From Swiss-Prot:
EC code: 6.1.1.21
Superkingdom of this protein's organism: Bacteria
PROSITE patterns: AA_TRNA_LIGASE_II
Gene giving rise to this polypeptide: hisS
CDD domains associated with the record: HisRS-like_core, HisRS_anticodon
Source species: Porphyromonas gingivalis (strain ATCC BAA-308 / W83)
GO molecular function, one term: histidine-tRNA ligase activity
Protein's name in the database: Histidine--tRNA ligase
Catalytic activity, as annotated: tRNA(His) + L-histidine + ATP = L-histidyl-tRNA(His) + AMP + diphosphate + H(+)
Amino acid sequence: MQKPSIPKGMRDFSPVEMSRRNYIFDTIREVYELFGFNQIETPTMEMLSTLMGKYGEEGDRLLFKVLNSGDVLADFCAEELAEKNSLRFAAKACEKGLRYDLTVPFARYVVMHRNEINFPFKRYQIQPVWRADRPQKGRYREFYQCDGDVIGSDSLMNEVELIQIISEVFRRLGIRTRILLNNRKILSGIAEVVDEADRLTDITVAIDKLDKIGLDKVNDELRTKGFGEEAIERLRPFIEMKGDNREKLDRLKSALASSETGLKGIEELTYILDKVERVQLHSELMVDISLARGLSYYTGAILEVKALDAEMGSITGGGRYDNLTGIFGLEGMSGVGISFGADRIYDVMMQLDLFPAEKLTGTQLLFVNFSEEDADSLLPLIQKLREQGLRTELYPEPAKIKKQMSYANAANIPYVALVGENERAAGQVNLKNMLTGEQQMLPADAATIVAAIV
């Protein structure tokens, strides 16, 4: 018999792993809702026409396509089958696909429901996405995204709120972080003043690698793309820019004085910094001119978050976009959003041992089952304990005490209650702390037992 297996790049999660993951998801959800965001969900499957062409050629290749129901081959003529063209086959045989991210489905949702939505629309979404990528360490075919967006508003106060959300989420999770901040308009201004305005993408792709490969290799990459030494020298002051946030912005204001676009980006960053300084931010906030993520669709602020105490790439990212819904015919709908990388956050918390033990406990109290009669007498008490929020189990059948204690140990249940004939007659519960081995006799009263455990 063939051993059961799961597809590569997919994962099972144990109860302990799910407790940890839900701790992250619940924290993100609670903070989003504190700031007035409302949750939506979109279907696992979208029409391929919704997904195709939105992620570039590489993204289209990584879409999981779903075969149509029924006898698919009956729709093909002999010549089409003989052609053995997988792309044409998929185009005709597959009308649906698994969502690649949460952004395009969100844009589709806004366009379809625009007459019902109250703008500005503050939405969050925590759902899995799928990519037909080559599985490797830290890269999966199924993973969760935790997105938050404000759409239908040009106000930079939305960026300020999203920065506060990021700071509060990581404060609650116990992760020290640095939020890197830049603006697409500043990058455009830099390209203008070095006389390479039409080569913005080449410039930003190279300088975005600065922290990974260093300045010399960034310059080498620029040379391989055809940049002359004069242009590289003009870029150097921007790439090497040091100082605190205000000093960087002052230098940029001088260096980009001839670029209206660049000055607009500086104005926007200055506004964000001014507002953020009025609140107590728990994360560091650093202007980083080399940050150039998502330039294919971000039009204003760009941000990325790094953990300070763990070796890990970006654990959150986001930015402002001006025309997300334009791909579905609704023009001019500005928005800004962020996405928490749940899997990377999980890995950071494991590295730093940040998951609180008390949050990861399943059952808090196990009642030993001595007999059917004893079990019957315990049911009302167990019901009251559950009503008071104590996660309580009754071992399902009478068994040897050793077996029931072993079950409690294996399940990391911190307390066990023993109520035999003597305890039942006295109206008491023998409560055992499984970590210390200490035992105490308590009245068989739900409030008293809860107080002793919690």
